[in-house]
Amino acid sequence: MAPGGSALKEVMESNSTGMDYEVKTAKVEVNNNKPTKPGSAGIGKYGIHSNNGVYELLECPVCTNLMYPPIHQCPNGHTLCSNCKLRVQNTCPTCRYELGNIRCLALEKVAESLEVPCRYQNLGCHDIFPYYSKLKHEQHCRFRPYTCPYAGSECSVTGDIPTLVVHLKDDHKVDMHDGCTFNHRYVKSNPHEVENATWMLTVFNCFGRQFCLHFEAFQLGMAPVYMAFLRFMGDENEAKKFSYSLEVGAHGRKLTWQGIPRSIRDSHRKVRDSQDGLIIPRNLALYFSGGDRQELKLRVTGRIWKEE
């Protein structure tokens, strides 16, 4: 959400009624600590399923993650990772001795000989890596969990796509629609007073995949603008298989945007700041709205298609 903005309820106008509705503020309480589902995003600490005691030796007793150099030890041989050494204020959490700066070089050397699976193996990654290459791979693994794409508030929930779809529907109360075309009217009674705002996103089920439609108001330099854009619930390589168009207009004039939906791997803010979408200056948006230009009534139409 843009700094200082508010989450606004998007209004979708039915072609059969021709009625406009005022945008409502979305007040949704979200449990950001909601556990992920087993077998989807609920996974083990580091994806190692082995009875080998070496792996247990490499587990930090404080954070329970695998340890990477420098691995520290106290005079009695108890080990812990470098991050936790700072957290425990240089005191061994096992025996309470002062840690000092003793490295456990033997354990670091043993780790070099190990091959371990990706921590996301139960999400589909079955590759095996040298111990010290595993962490770098996991930062970019295509099977790693996605972050919730909701833009109306900060949400820390992660998971696979099916888990996030349920989360968006149940926890954020996001509207879900089937189809590859859309026709929305965004309404706001006091657009001149709203410099930063994020409307409630809508999720479309299209070609068996999910797409998030965003709409918001923010300042582009000194100019107030509105922006609409689409994000794909999947990886960037999959997103490139699709294209979409957005259009606004009235009085014989129109603005059209065509592009490729961005993956939700890219944050909402990153996409907005890159201006990768349909940008409508506020004066033009109010012109398209008609009337005395004191109320936003902006119709955004669009469609999604699959590239052959």
UniProtKB/Swiss-Prot annotation:
Residue ranges of the region described as SBD: 110-303
Alphabetical UniProt keywords: Cytoplasmic vesicle, Endosome, Metal-binding, Transferase, Ubl conjugation pathway, Zinc, Zinc-finger
InterPro entries named among the record's database cross-references: 7-in-absentia-prot_TRAF-dom (IPR018121), E3_ubiquitin-ligase_SINA (IPR052088), Sina-like_RING (IPR049548), TRAF-like (IPR008974), Znf_RING (IPR001841), Znf_RING/FYVE/PHD (IPR013083), Znf_SIAH (IPR013010)
Protein induction: Induced by drought stress, salt stress, osmotic shock and abscisic acid (ABA).
GO molecular function, one term: transferase activity
Primary localization: other
Binding residues for Zn(2+) 2: 148, 155, 167, 172
Listed SUPFAM superfamilies: RING/U-box, TRAF domain-like
Zinc finger region(s), RING-type: 60-96
UniProt similarity note: Belongs to the SINA (Seven in absentia) family.
Subunit structure: Interacts with RAP2-2. Interacts with SINAT6. Interacts with ATG6 and TRAF1A. Interacts with WAV3. Interacts with FREE1. Interacts with ELC/VPS23A.
UniProt name for this protein: E3 ubiquitin-protein ligase SINAT2
Source organism of the structure: Arabidopsis thaliana (Mouse-ear cress)
Lineage: Eukaryota, Viridiplantae, Streptophyta, Embryophyta, Tracheophyta
